[in-house]
Amino acid sequence: MMKLKEFFINIISIFRSVYMVGMQAFSKRETYMYPDVACKLSSRYRGRIVLTRDSAGHERCVACNLCAVSCPVGCISLKKSENSEGRWYPEFFRINFSRCIFCGMCEEACPTAAIQLISDFEMSDYKRSDLVYEKSDLLISGPGKYKNYDFYQISGVKYSNKYKKESSFEEKPISVKTILP
């Protein structure tokens, strides 16, 4: 009697398994075939780093080195140089994407909005040396996310013919010698 009961339980179990496999075989897929179907990324997705230009077409980067200091893995290196007008620019700007963790700290630290993270994530390569991007690889032709922001219009730049004038609401600086007893 026990053997007959086990036999029917095993038969029912087999049919149930075949039914479940058949239902899953013809149902909608949960996974997407990646190269054929593009992934939908969030608007705040942090992908590859790019260097942007201002509205005049100049590089926004002033080589302040804040991005390299704020990078937790130290994948950014640059060297500051100065042109004839007194404007700073990076002589070289290098990012090692094999070390980059795409945290966005460099983008937050950049005062000129020169560094921006875009939604490009397809960066795999066979050689690590090909993942070291130079300034020419990183520079894009447009302003990126912040189209109207111009660092030099806000902060100024040292030009020989530019002078600083006092504002009407600004108080005169206090002289330390006059307040001493």
Curated annotation (Swiss-Prot):
InterPro entries: 4Fe4S_Fe-S-bd, 4Fe4S_Fe_S_CS, NADH_quinone_OxRdtase_chainI. [4Fe-4S] cluster 2 binds at C71, C100, C103, C106. Residues 52-81, 91-120 form the 4Fe-4S ferredoxin-type domain. Its cofactor is [4Fe-4S] cluster. It is a peripheral membrane protein. HAMAP family: NDH1_NuoI (MF_01351). This is NADH-quinone oxidoreductase subunit I. It comes from Blochmanniella floridana.
